[in-house]
Amino acid sequence: MSQLLQQLGTDNEFIRRHNGPASSEHQHMLNTIGAETLQQLIEETVPSSIRLPQPMQLPHGLSENAMLAELKQIAQQNTLNTSYIGQGYYNTHTPNVILRNVLENPGWYTAYTPYQPEISQGRLEALLNYQQMVMDLTGLEIANASLLDEATAAAEAMTLCKRGGKSKSNLFFVADDVHPQTLAVIKTRAKFIGFDVVVDHESNLDSHDVFGALLQYPGTTGEVKDLTDLIAQAHTKKTLVIVATDLLASVLLKPVGEMGADIAIGSAQRFGVPMGYGGPHAAFMATREKLKRSMPGRVIGVSIDSKGNQALRMAMQTREQHIRREKATSNICTAQALLANMASFYAVYHGPEGLKTIARRVHHFTAIVAKALQTAGFELEHQHFFDTLTVKTEQQTDILYTKALASSINLRKFDTKLGISFDETTTVSDLVTLLAVFGIDNAECETLSAEVGKDEFAAIPKHCQRTSSFLTHPVFNTYHSETQMLRYLKKLENKDFSLTHGMIPLGSCTMKLNAVAEMLPVTWPEFGGIHPFAPLNQAAGYTTLATSLKSMLCEITGYDEFSLQPNSGASGEYAGLIAIQRYHESRGDAHRNVCLIPSSAHGTNPATASMVSMKVVVVKCDENGNIDMIDLAEKIEKHQENLSSIMITYPSTHGVYEEQVREVCDMVHAAGGQVYLDGANMNAQVGLTSPGFIGSDVSHLNLHKTFCIPHGGGGPGMGPIGVKSHLAPFLPGHTENGVQGMDYAVSAADLGSASILPISWAYIAMMGEMGLTEATKVAILNANYVMERLRPHYPVLYRGTNGRIAHECIIDIRPLKETTGISEEDIAKRLMDFGFHAPTMSFPVAGTLMVEPTESEDLAELDRFCDAMIAIREEMNKVEQGEWPLDNNPLVNAPHTQVDLMSDSWEHPYTREVACFPSSQSKDSKYWPTVNRVDNVYGDRNLICSCPSIENYEE
């Protein structure tokens, strides 16, 4: 290729779109830092002992158009049959107003988990709607704001039964009509937490002494039956009962809460979220009031702000793993907020009457096919059903199944039966084509409809028909035209801060660019329309994508094999520790159960270790934030016989590259342990070092951090795990289509949240080796630039040997609080007035702020943030000097709202301009918090987790 063609080519052009600072700005930043070149900065920051000896072997970066063309070719390898498989996954219509204004909208998908409620009221309201929807449809008192998938929700519910119940038993019951993928995940969780599982017909529940039971309603084979007496009998033996249920079925069926269920779980996928070959989708959990403080996952509650106005927040956070660590009830962090929002908006848009129409149509089509099949001489397994039929096909099973495939139809095959599940996308012409497979040609569906319509709900027992009202809150009965819905979505979006407004400098969260080109393929039907349990040859595109992505990730990490199954970082940690424990078992070392964890670790680490019955032993950190090598040696010697592993994060959670990391790995290996390297900070490794090169045995990667899957306001996430070859046999399997066997599943689908994998593939493909390495270097450049600008004004807690930091820095507010009285929370809230999301507060050290700018923020935005922080420091000086009283200044009163600006009274010693327009940039483009500082204590003491009455909104 000629030099001119190279100059005019589009390869690698995405790199400058992704990385914020222009190359012409690097020198100014380096001058501020005190380095002559970017390479010098890297050499002073990353220890030479761990730097890769040669570049990664990855292709050069593709242009956006070239990447999309290649990915489209991969997508077109998938075959889109009409799916009647069911088993918890259904085709659905995503309302276009939700598709365009939520799923495809960076105002929704680039926001962070709503830990800062003052700038998150929109998605908090959407998630509260989700909770209300689940509570109404299940008939239970409280619900959480989503879990990862139905199978993991069932596993969480099992542990909740043990925690919240009074039974002394260690046995858990699973009905034999539960989805097989759910049973598989339950078995994995039970094995490693120490429970026994019995699978039996639900009628035999009373013959077992169990602490909890999981039933399915309707069952996986479609049967609808009243569970009231069964549940009541279980309660006499102190057994808590979980029922996995279907939200659309619950529109017509008696809700499980009215049957006495203690816990309801399930998936909200069919409420407008594509199947996506398994995910992501929002699972739900609802419980009785008595179990609320033990329930896993995030819960949205109603509180008030400092002015007494209604404000929403995440409630009961002291339950969560980042607080309780090894004593946490769950390791859940990221769930499925974006998908929960989509499901809640689906319910808002359709309303109760719209949902009834959809449910009636699905049931009616099921009844039509049932009538036609029975008339033709086929026998049904069950006479009572909602949307699923199981047809006894005996010797014809394989013939009919193959005939269906020839007609581009997927049925669910049992040994001598075929399952057929219907959904809202089913049409009359679909029924005609389907019935032809069973030898019923030119079926008269209109005639059949008239016959079935004489008793529309004959297939639902009278005592199983819903009589109670649901979704009565005005929010579900108002926004039914597209204009109304569009404006409601926009109103909520406008309340929230996202990357569309400015930098989100959250340490340990890597809030980088989620490029549009990376996001586009998520909505392609070739990726969205495939059932996760379709025959593998129909998912050739997904197989190609997964193989390619795993190969890329192996090259980036230095591992030998990957599993893409874990659908969150916490799930990846769990899968990784299971792999370690299975490895030890295979070598006759099942007694190895001690997990060493540095005191600086994220709370998920000890919470996950506890989930696999490990004994957590904390290793001290020294005054520089590094692992205390003397304490480590003592702990290894003390626990050598039982040492399973160590969990470390690299660079450390303190934001530095620890010089002795290889020595740490060697010491643990010498004692027979394995090294788990948490991939949360992989954004500071790519292209410069790697977990495998450092000496780690297994890591999870947060694809929603380093590899550009958006945070979605609290999910979706992806946490695939990479392993060295000796751990590869112990990666999770799956009961359906599993490439690693059938056992030890950690998610409902083998590829986890498969439909968002194209995002990470696209990012790597467009960046290439050069771009990925450059991104890491720029992330380090940006972080050190911010540190050097702030260091004259704020103490920086930890730095490396040469005074450098990795990709994030910790600012110590504790000494400033002693002299000024201003806390890290005051600074965080004041940043909102300047147009910024707060850094990470009080993690990993209480009383600090951790800042991670990522490589995507340009110099102007970095300066805007630094200027804001310096201005805040000057405001703190005014408090310290007595110019402003400690109880009445712009920091303790932050954030300020438009209502504050327009208030008739102003009883503050600072002006409205200082309050609301503290910088010139805020006058140019102002983001407004919609509530004042939220009262967390009030919210937990007066716990309300349902939609407030309409009067509250009117106020």
Curated annotation (Swiss-Prot):
Keywords: Oxidoreductase, Pyridoxal phosphate. GO terms for molecular function: glycine binding; glycine dehydrogenase (decarboxylating) activity; pyridoxal phosphate binding. The keyword Oxidoreductase applies. One of its GO terms (biological process) is glycine decarboxylation via glycine cleavage system. It comes from the Bacteria. Its cofactor is pyridoxal 5'-phosphate. InterPro entries: GcvP, GDC-P_C, GDC-P_N, GDC_P, PyrdxlP-dep_Trfase, PyrdxlP-dep_Trfase_major, PyrdxlP-dep_Trfase_small. Transmembrane segments: none annotated. GO terms for cellular component: cytosol; glycine cleavage complex. PANTHER family: GLYCINE DEHYDROGENASE (DECARBOXYLATING) (PTHR11773:SF13), GLYCINE DEHYDROGENASE, DECARBOXYLATING (PTHR11773). Belongs to the GcvP family. The glycine cleavage system is composed of four proteins: P, T, L and H. This is Glycine dehydrogenase (decarboxylating). It comes from Aliivibrio fischeri (strain ATCC 700601 / ES114) (Vibrio fischeri).
